[in-house]
């Protein structure tokens, strides 16, 4: 279990230094990470990539500390064959407990339920290693922070380390903040796909799309990229 207080304290301290309200803390951190791992970071050289990240880690030191803690926490979870949704935990603690859940109808799927649903759906041992699933799309049209997709990816990857990456994951949600969270979760776990911010009942024009892990850097790094495509403002 992660230390939520550690994250919340650092988030609130950085936003206070930036002159931003506490309510924006999680969104500001997500924006920071999306910039840190933007496709714009790669100019064709390892030095350019390192300089991009170093500049941003130094510009907001408290967010930099949190970024390193986040990467480490997710890495340790994946080493145990698990997925980790730090953003979802913080969102529930910082926002939904303050009454937003009852107003918006947002209730995040518990990890145990996500894992159970993934095991029921299951890709199956034979299917997970079969060429016929190459490029198969897995979609969640009310994805939130992406827990069901994370669970599916880890379940598939248990059978074959690279099996999860044969899937294309598509997440949709109408909440701009949780779309950011979902994009970062998919990126750091090594998934391929995109996150679409739109009303899936009305199939509205996406306000923004996140393309996950399109770039494969020609040097050793476990973390990939996010490309952001802006659309029409959400109505």
Q: What is the predicted function of each stretch?
A:
Residues 169-173:
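Conserved SAM-binding motif I beta-strand of class I
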Residues 133-135, 166, 192:
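A general structural motif
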Residues 162, 175, 180-225:
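S-adenosyl-L-methionine
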Residues 154-168, 190:
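Conserved S-adenosyl-L-methionine
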